[in-house]
Every structure is written in structure tokens, then in C-alpha cells.
Regions:
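Short loop/turn motifs that connect adjacent beta-strands in outer-membrane beta-barrel proteins
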Residues: 34, 150, 168-176, 202-203, ...
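N-terminal periplasmic "start-of-domain" segments of outer-membrane beta-barrel proteins
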Residues: 39-67
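Extracytoplasmic beta-strand/coil segments of soluble accessory domains associated
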Residues: 75, 79-116
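A beta-strand signature from Gram-negative outer-membrane beta-barrel systems
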Residues: 132-179
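Flexible loop and strand-edge segments within Gram-negative outer membrane beta-barrel domains
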Residues: 217-219, 228, 234-247, 253-311, ...
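Membrane-embedded beta-barrel scaffold of Gram-negative outer-membrane proteins
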Residues: 308-324, 438, 445-448, 474-533, ...
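Structural signature of Gram-negative outer-membrane beta-barrels, strongest in the C-terminal barrel
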Residues: 356-505
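Gram-negative outer-membrane beta-barrel transporters
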Residues: 357, 399, 497-506, 523-573
């Protein structure tokens, strides 16, 4: 269900013109020079019309839609988006990343309550650690959102997955909400969760939620010892696939007025996961293990000074820890054990100016400091200083929507040991438009173009024997043209919508692992060009055979072709 919020300002003098007001002995005089405001009105709309009107492909799952998917994690729900590949490394407890239109997980940003998540070590975000129990809305943007009032980081990727968590809602007579859930399933899955929401007064609200998940992952499989008919086979169970995770979140919400809000969120996550090895004949021994911890605190403040000027700011501190253990390594210590630490300090500020009712501009600037350390010998201990500034504009009328932006990126890197990867300066543009050729039909033609890049991760740059500090940013150019249509057909078919988008992505200076001296010695290189072509089709309809019964149907189709078009001579350099 889609919700839209309207804030209306009315003059008392207008009420006097249209309302008949009885006269009493002591009639209260109305100050006609003062502007009176009515409380915020929330209007609910059954159908998703924003996706059809957007200038770039947008897909949304509301809270009700997520319930109908019967998904356990965010990664399960994201698989239902068109043009998306969820890469699953290691099954139940493994890393799960999202890639949009074959560009790779490093080109896809993940936002959590309006602030992006980061991992400078790998450049990839594990979306498998987010549950759907406290998610209010999932949205996926290709290219860029039509919302120009957002942090600069939201302009700095080829696409973004937005995770919006629940905001406490209360009835007039109820100030406390408590909800619990217990899920269980195959392979020893146990998943309890608890949610507590409290309203202190009209201004302050709080929410606390947590969950624990455990699974042994011992799923059965058949191991065949030959391909010919009659060859031996045996029934086995996967080993070292256990996983235990714990997540806790706390939020404080300050609603000072309809024009001023503040939000504070604290997040903690930890996991313990077995790392199963490849299945081989007569050897199922596997003991590798991985431990993860992550915590962050983020704050957001928004103030609407007038109908023309709006300001918002965000701040975040993030800390993460990872420990890897292989007790069967053949070395003098008889094990391999490494620990990695990351920290981030992030600050953002944005201002929106509405020049006209249908023309607005925004300016956003973000600054961040990312550090990494490890218990490895001679580890370089890199630090990345990032400064992003985005200037954007948007024009909207009944038949045309145009959005454009320019992102300036400044990156400085420093290390305590060895050589650093150097600094980067780049300006990247974006433009999109949607045109409605017929006045009485919700039919639109849309297109967008975006020039973007992604930096090499700390692992790509500094990992022992594999890292390469000479790596250049991996660049991507995106082209998209599409058609959208929606219609209220009849009482039996109250809603019908469809979108068709064709796209072309060109990736240059692709960062890949490449063998150097022999197949046992690899290094990271800018060696590759990729052409990506595809079509995304989505459709949804709503049937209402009876007054109190509604049937919603939706589906999507994706065709992708990604080709390595690197010149043959370059491959042997």
C-alpha cells in the first residue's frame, strides 16, 4: 500500500466566505491576517503509481507486499525485483550481495533509513544480515531516484537498494506496542524476534527490536562417484554449515512539528558461520569458520524553514570486525587466523530550494573517513578521505518530468606503511526525463543516462601479494529507454500497469583478478571491457470480483547479455 502525505495551509477568511457560522453572545473573532494549519493528513492509495511515473526504473515492495512474499530475509525479497541478481556465497549463512543489470555488487549501493551502508574492505554489502521483521518498505532504483533531496552518496552509484524500517505508529488510546514472532523450518532453523514501541508524548517515540537466528544447515545431497549408469552413489549431508546470528536495533524519534523531525538509530549485528568447503570424494572434513560483528549509530535531522527552503543533515559512526580461522593450515602454526577492523566517520548536509511550484534545486555534500586495520605482518593500514558534492535540479508538469545532476568526487588515500593508491578527482553527470504524449492516458516514455564509477576496495588495493595500488576506478556508462502504462479499466479490473525498459551498459577499466606468473599467483588489474544489454519487463493487475475480495497479481521478466569485449591484445598485456 502506498502512502502519500499532504500538508495543507488555509486562511480563516476563506472559511468565512463558504461556511455559515452561527452568531453567539460572545462570538470569537478570527484573525484574518494569520495563517492557520491543519494537522497532517495521510491518504492511502492501494496502487503503486510512482513506479509508472518515475523517469528511471523504480520498483517498490510495501510492507503488505513483503508479507505476501513469505520471505525470511531482505535478500529473499530482492530476488523478486526485475533486473537483479542476488549472489549467494555459501548457502544459509553465506554472503549475499545484490547486483543490478550485471554491473556487479560494487556498483550497487544499499541505503538503510536514508544513509548508505559501506564496506571499504570488499566494496560489497551483505544484505543477508537484514531481516524483514522490521522493514516497512523496499525500493530499488536503477540509475537514480527522482528524489533530488538526498545525501550525495545516493548519487554515487549505478543503482541503489533502499531499506526503510518501521516507524512507530500509535492509536489515540494506546502508547505501547509489543509484537513477537517465532519462525522455524528445515535444517534446524530457529528464528525468534521481538519488537517494542513506546510513545512518551506527542513529540518523542522509541522502538527496540531484536532477533536471533540459528540453523545447522545439514541439508542432504547425493554424491555420485561416476557419470555412467550403475556407478556407485551415496547419500551425504553438508557439513560445517552452521550459522548463528543476532541483531538488535534501537530508535528514538523526535517529531517537533510537521516541519521539523529528528531520528537517532543504533544497530548491532554479530554472526558465527561455518565455511563449508567443496565436496570431494572420500573427504568431507571442513573446519573453516568466520565471525562478524558490526555496529553503527546514525542520526538524521530535517527542518523545513519555508515552502521554498528545506534543510537536512545526517551523521554516522560505523565499526566492523571480522575474524577468520582455518585450524587445518599446513604451516608452522598449524592454523591460519586473521582479524580485520574497519571504522567510518560520516557527515552529510543537504539543502532544497523550490524556485517555483514545479521547479526545484538541491545541493548536497558528504564527507567521510574510512580506516582499516588487520593483524597481518606489515599491513599498510589504509585511510580513505572522501568528499562528495552533488548539485541537482528537477522540473515537473502534467506531461513532462526532467531531472539532472552533477556529482563531484574527491578521494584522498593515505597509508602508514608502503605506498598508497593515490588520489582521485572526477565529475560525473546524470540526466533523465519522462514524457506523457497523451493527456487522458497514463502512458509515458522515459530515458536516462548516467556516467558513474566505483573505486577499488581495500582488498583490491592492499591485500598481500594480490593487491595492486595502481588500479584505476572502474567506470560504467548507463543508457536506458522505456515505456510505462497504467489504467483503471473497469470495476472488475480496477488497476493495470506495465513497464518495459531496454538498457545498455558499457564498463571500462574493469577490475578483475588475473594470473601473473602462473595460475597460483594472481593479482588485481584493470583489464577488461564489458558490454551489457538487456530488457526488463514488469506487470501488475488487480482483480475485484466481489466488493470485499481483491486479487493482486504481478510478475516480471528479465533478459540480460553481458559480453567481454576486451581487445585480444589487451588480454595478454
Amino acid at each position: 500500500m502506498k502512502e502519500r502525505t499532504f500538508k495543507k495551509m488555509i486562511f480563516a477568511v476563506f472559511c468565512c466566505q463558504f461556511l455559515s457560522i452561527p452568531l453567539f453572545a460572545q462570538q470569537q473573532k478570527v484573525d484574518t491576517t494569520h495563517t492557520y494549519s491543519i494537522p497532517e493528513i495521510t491518504v492511502s492509495d492501494i496502487y503503486q503509481t510512482r513506479e509508472v511515473r518515475s523517469t528511471a526504473p523504480l520498483q517498490v515492495f510495501s510492507k503488505d507486499a513483503l508479507k505476501n512474499l513469505h520471505a525470511l530475509q531482505v535478500s529473499d525479497a530482492v530476488k523478486h525485483f526485475a533486473g537483479v541478481t542476488v549472489k549467494d556465497y555459501g548457502g544459509i549463512g553465506g554472503l549475499k550481495t545484490v547486483s543490478i543489470r550485471s554491473l556487479g555488487a560494487q556498483h550497487t549501493a544499499v541505503g538503510y533509513d536514508g544513509i548508505t551502508l559501506t564496506d571499504c574492505q570488499t566494496g560489497q554489502i551483505d544484505i543477508g544480515r537484514f531481516s524483514l521483521d522490521n522493514v516497512d518498505r523496499l525500493s530499488l532504483n536503477n540509475g537514480q531516484s527522482d528524489n533530488i533531496f538526498q545525501p550525495a552518496r545516493f548519487f554515487a552509484s549505478a543503482g541503489i537498494l533502499n531499506i526503510q524500517t518501521l516507524t512507530p505508529q500509535f492509536t489515540k488510546d494506546k502508547k505501547t506496542n509489543i509484537a513477537g514472532a517465532f519462525k522455524t523450518g528445515s535444517w534446524g532453523l530457529v528464528n525468534p524476534s521481538l519488537l517494542l514501541e513506546q510513545q512518551f508524548n506527542k513529540t518523542w517515540r522509541m522502538s527496540v527490536n531484536g532477533e536471533w537466528m540459528s540453523s545447522d544447515g545439514h541439508y542432504p545431497y547425493t554424491l555420485r562417484y561416476g557419470s555412467a549408469e550403475g556407478d556407485l552413489s551415496s547419500r551425504e549431508k553438508r557439513k560445517n554449515t552452521d550459522v548463528q546470528t543476532f541483531r538488535a536495533e534501537a530508535g528514538l524519534y523526535g517529531n517537533f512539528s510537521d516541519k521539523e523531525q529528528w531520528r537517532l538509530k543504533a544497530y548491532y549485528f554479530q554472526s558465527s558461520r561455518g565455511l563449508p568447503k567443496a565436496t570431494t570424494f572420500y573427504n568431507d572434513h571442513s573446519t573453516q569458520h568466520l565471525w562478524d560483528k558490526n555496529t553503527f549509530i546514525q542520526s538524521q535531522y530535517k527542518k523545513e524553514f519555508s515552502q521554498q527552503w528545506v534543510f537536512q543533515t545526517s551523521a554516522k559512526w560505523n565499526w566492523s570486525y571480522q575474524r577468520y580461522l582455518d585450524p587445518d593450515t599446513k604451516n608452522s602454526l598449524k592454523k591460519t587466523e586473521n582479524s580485520y577492523y574497519q571504522q567510518e566517520y560520516y557527515l552529510s548536509a543537504s539543502v532544497l530550494y523550490r524556485l517555483l511550484s514545479n521547479l526545484s534545486f538541491s545541493l548536497s555534500t558528504d564527507g567521510s573517513i574510512n580506516t582499516m586495520n588487520a593483524d597481518l605482518n606489515n599491513f599498510v593500514q589504509p585511510t580513505r578521505y572522501s568528499w562528495l558534492t552533488a548539485f541537482a535540479g528537477k522540473y515537473v508538469n502534467d506531461w513532462l518530468t526532467i531531472s539532472a545532476s552533477a556529482l563531484a568526487t574527491i578521494i584522498n588515500e593515505d597509508v602508514k606503511k608502503g605506498g598508497s593508491a593515490g588520489n582521485h578527482r572526477k565529475l560525473t553527470p546524470y540526466v533523465s526525463a519522462a514524457f506523457k504524449p497523451f493527456h487522458n492516458e497514463e502512458f509515458r516514455v522515459r530515458f536516462f543516462y548516467k556516467d558513474i564509477f566505483r573505486l577499488a576496495s581495500f582488498n583490491d588495493l592492499y591485500y598481500e601479494e594480490v593487491g595492486n595500488t595502481q588500479l584505476k576506478p572502474e567506470k560504467a556508462k548507463q543508457y536506458n529507454i522505456g515505456l510505462t502504462y497504467s489504467k483503471n479499466v473497469c470495476p472488475f479490473l480496477p488497476y493495470l500497469s506495465a513497464t518495459v525498459d531496454a538498457y545498455y551498459n558499457k564498463v571500462t577499466d574493469k577490475i578483475i583478478a588475473y594470473p601473473t606468473k602462473n595460475l597460483a599467483v594472481w593479482s588485481m588489474k584493470n583489464l577488461g571491457q564489458v558490454d551489457i544489454k538487456g530488457i526488463d519487463i514488469t506487470g501488475s493487475l488487480s482483480l475485484q470480483p466481489w466488493e470485499k475480495i481483491r486479487i493482486n497479481l504481478s510478475g516480471n521478466y528479465t533478459y540480460q547479455r553481458a559480453l567481454d569485449v576486451t581487445p585480444p591484445r589487451s588480454k595478454h598485456v
